[in-house]
């Protein structure tokens, strides 16, 4: 998977502004597209399936190029619909094969997000963003330094997959270079619940990108009610940004812990696994920072927490730990743990029979490593005001408050 097929540089599509009265088909999953074709276009459902394959399998956005559609249907589509994908500001390869795209969201140039493709020997993983910025203020994350602006639409989320898959020459079921998607980019996915779940549906649909449920992973900082809702409405792998083994420390790193402490978070994760026997484990992400959370006593405390989690689920290896060496960014006060401390931390966990791996740092030469994403954004004060407005408005079940 390390070899990425070189394709011609992808130019931004000439049209990026939505047209009033037209439906962006990237905003729709299979059910939504079928409904649009039946109720708006007066067509059969199978026509929606044809168009979905043109968009997500062949990366065609011009209805006139969808050659197995009749002229009448193409005319209807031209009148009522469009396919708008994110504009590419730049794409940047890393020496290790990692690739980062900066994608413009909207037409004002003020909102941009980053998407990262990470190739490995047996798989290719795309790290996808769910928000422009983030308002959770995790103190060790670069994205948090920019504050929050807005949620991404379904089209803007799945559009990241479209851009990357097109660049890679990915053909579902034939030439698969994109094997996994992780919702671990900019933003808290569960604060944009509906759009994220709809986008993940397209990722897992055979008419979309055909990924198995377990190959789509949602990472959350720990919004307990939304984890329970996710369990009922979707079926993907769950990862939790833990980063500390106790509430006192986690509250300094992940302020959301004050609202949803570790005991509540772990209980919701146990419910998530128990609700579906096909769900085998939850991954707990733990970023190691020098002198902060990398001491032997932290490792022993984390091991106890994982044993308690196994007992709650009543299954061995229900919790897996992913140790992440901290990736520095300008202005941070944190430092990466020394390699010897990382290995010693891992050994304590392994000796306690906790499945543990250390994530290799990839893409740090292009600021694409874990915790380094932040895009081109507005000033923090304005963005935080937008986040507070979102919380106050409630935004249904998509808000954290």
Swiss-Prot record:
One of its GO terms (molecular function) is metal ion binding. PROSITE patterns: RADICAL_SAM (PS51918). Binds 1 [4Fe-4S] cluster. The cluster is coordinated with 3 cysteines and an exchangeable S-adenosyl-L-methionine. Residues 120-365 form the Radical SAM core domain. GO terms for biological process: rRNA base methylation; tRNA methylation. Keywords: 4Fe-4S, Cytoplasm, Disulfide bond, Iron, Iron-sulfur, Metal-binding, Methyltransferase, rRNA processing, S-adenosyl-L-methionine, Transferase, tRNA processing. It holds the Pfam family Radical_SAM. Disulfide bonds join 127-370. S-adenosyl-L-methionine binds at residues 187-188, 219, 241-243, 327. It catalyses: adenosine(2503) in 23S rRNA + 2 reduced [2Fe-2S]-[ferredoxin] + 2 S-adenosyl-L-methionine = 2-methyladenosine(2503) in 23S rRNA + 5'-deoxyadenosine + L-methionine + 2 oxidized [2Fe-2S]-[ferredoxin] + S-adenosyl-L-homocysteine; adenosine(37) in tRNA + 2 reduced [2Fe-2S]-[ferredoxin] + 2 S-adenosyl-L-methionine = 2-methyladenosine(37) in tRNA + 5'-deoxyadenosine + L-methionine + 2 oxidized [2Fe-2S]-[ferredoxin] + S-adenosyl-L-homocysteine. Its cofactor is [4Fe-4S] cluster. It is found in: Cytoplasm. GO terms for cellular component: cytoplasm. CDD domains: Radical_SAM (cd01335). HAMAP family: RNA_methyltr_RlmN. Reaction proceeds by a ping-pong mechanism involving intermediate methylation of a conserved cysteine residue. Belongs to the radical SAM superfamily. RlmN family. Specifically methylates position 2 of adenine 2503 in 23S rRNA and position 2 of adenine 37 in tRNAs. m2A2503 modification seems to play a crucial role in the proofreading step occurring at the peptidyl transferase center and thus would serve to optimize ribosomal fidelity. This is Dual-specificity RNA methyltransferase RlmN. It comes from Stenotrophomonas maltophilia (strain K279a). The gene is rlmN.
């Amino acid at each position: 998977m390390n070899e990425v097929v070189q394709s011609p540089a992808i130019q931004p599509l000439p049209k990026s502004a939505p047209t009033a009265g037209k439906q962006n088909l990237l905003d729709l999953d299979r059910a939504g597209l079928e409904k649009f074709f039946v109720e708006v276009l007066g067509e059969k459902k199978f026509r929606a399936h044809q168009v979905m394959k043109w968009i997500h399998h062949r990366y065609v956005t011009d209805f006139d190029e969808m050659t197995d559609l009749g002229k009448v249907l193409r005319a209807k589509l031209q009148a009522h619909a469009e396919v708008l994908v994110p504009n590419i500001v730049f794409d940047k390869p890393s020496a290790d094969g990692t690739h980062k795209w900066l994608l413009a969201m909207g037409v004002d140039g003020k909102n941009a997000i980053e998407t990262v493709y990470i190739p490995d020997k047996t798989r290719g993983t795309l790290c996808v963003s769910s928000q422009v910025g983030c308002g959770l203020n995790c103190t060790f994350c670069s994205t948090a330094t920019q504050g929050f602006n807005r949620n991404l639409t379904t089209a803007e989320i799945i559009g990241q997959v479209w851009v990357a898959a097109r660049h890679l020459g990915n053909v579902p079921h034939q030439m698969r270079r994109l094997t996994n998607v992780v919702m671990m980019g900019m933003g808290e996915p569960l604060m944009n619940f509906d759009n994220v779940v709809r986008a993940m549906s397209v990722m897992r649909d055979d008419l979309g990108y055909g990924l198995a449920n377990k190959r789509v992973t949602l990472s959350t900082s720990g919004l307990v009610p939304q984890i329970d809702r996710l369990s009922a409405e979707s079926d993907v792998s769950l990862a939790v940004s833990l980063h500390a083994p106790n509430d006192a420390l986690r509250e300094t790193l992940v302020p959301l812990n004050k609202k949803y402490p570790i005991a509540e978070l772990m209980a919701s994760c146990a419910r998530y696994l128990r609700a579906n026997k096909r769900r085998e484990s939850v991954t707990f992400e733990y970023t190691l920072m020098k002198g902060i959370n990398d001491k032997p006593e932290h490792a022993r405390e984390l091991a106890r927490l994982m044993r308690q989690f196994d007992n709650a689920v009543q299954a061995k290896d229900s919790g897996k730990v992913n140790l992440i060496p901290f990736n520095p960014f300008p202005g941070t006060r944190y430092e990466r743990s020394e390699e010897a401390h990382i290995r010693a931390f891992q050994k304590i966990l392994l000796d306690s029979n906790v499945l543990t791996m250390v994530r290799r740092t990839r893409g740090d030469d292009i600021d694409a490593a874990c915790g380094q994403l932040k895009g081109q954004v507005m000033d923090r004060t304005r963005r935080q005001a937008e986040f507070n407005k979102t919380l106050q408005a409630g935004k249904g079940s998509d808000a954290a408050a």
